[in-house]
A protein has these predicted regions:
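Soluble "head" domains of membrane/secretory-pathway proteins
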Residues: 1-209
């Protein structure tokens, strides 16, 4: 992906943010800030849709939900391939393929628009993929797949939803880890050096980072 860093203050909901990965601060990640401090974030792994309720500090009733809307699901221009190398290591790659063509061992990704309040962006999903919800970060006192963002922290998600290791799996990003805002995230995904564009290792959470 291409990214242009912009000086960051407090990210707004929907901003694309570059930050130090909390579990390994040597790594920079780029994700979208979907949850701000005090937000209650719920993700439905079946419909792959978000519910966001602002102003839900612990122990406080929160009834108002942020308007979150989705366009119809459509085929995207991208195909994701899956294969195994000698020795059984699973790899994956992304290719731009005309909609009237197919690719061996490939699955065409779906695309739709997600609107968080007044911010609209495109997201990608893999039609056959389901999150391993049991690997989600479970916040103490909250149901699985529901998180209340603590003060001074943020809930980040990738737009390439089924190929993103993000706050669903490892929790919140402290404000101190923020590096800057960015202008592009489309088709980015977490990777190890040297593994793009030939493929990426399947992560321990069962998706592609």
């Amino acid at each position: 992906y291409q990214k242009t860093l912009i000086e960051t203050g407090h990210p707004k909901r929907g901003d694309i943010v570059v930050f130090k990965y909390p579990e390994d601060p040597k790594l920079d990640y780029i994700k979208r800030a979907v949850g701000l401090p005090g937000d209650k974030v719920t993700y439905d792994p079946v419909s792959k849709e978000l519910t966001i309720q602002p102003g839900c500090s612990s122990g406080q009733a929160c009834e108002n939900a942020l308007p979150v809307t989705y366009s119809n699901v459509e085929p995207s221009d991208f195909v994701q391939t899956f294969s195994r190398r000698n020795g059984g290591e699973a790899t994956s790659g992304f290719f731009e393929v005309p909609k009237n063509e197919t690719k061996e061992n490939g699955i065409r990704l779906s695309e739709r628009k997600e609107t968080l309040g007044d911010v609209t962006h495109r997201i990608l999903t893999v039609p056959i993929a389901q999150d391993q919800v049991g690997m989600y970060y479970q916040q103490p006192g909250q149901q699985l797949a529901t998180w209340i963002v603590p003060p001074g922290q943020y809930f980040m998600m990738g737009d390439n939803r089924d190929n993103s290791a993000d706050s669903r799996y490892w929790g919140f990003v402290p404000e101190a880890n923020l590096v800057g805002r960015a202008t592009a995230i489309w088709m980015s995904f977490d990777k190890q050096e040297g593994e793009w564009p030939t493929g990426v290792r399947l992560s321990r959470i069962g998706g592609i980072h």
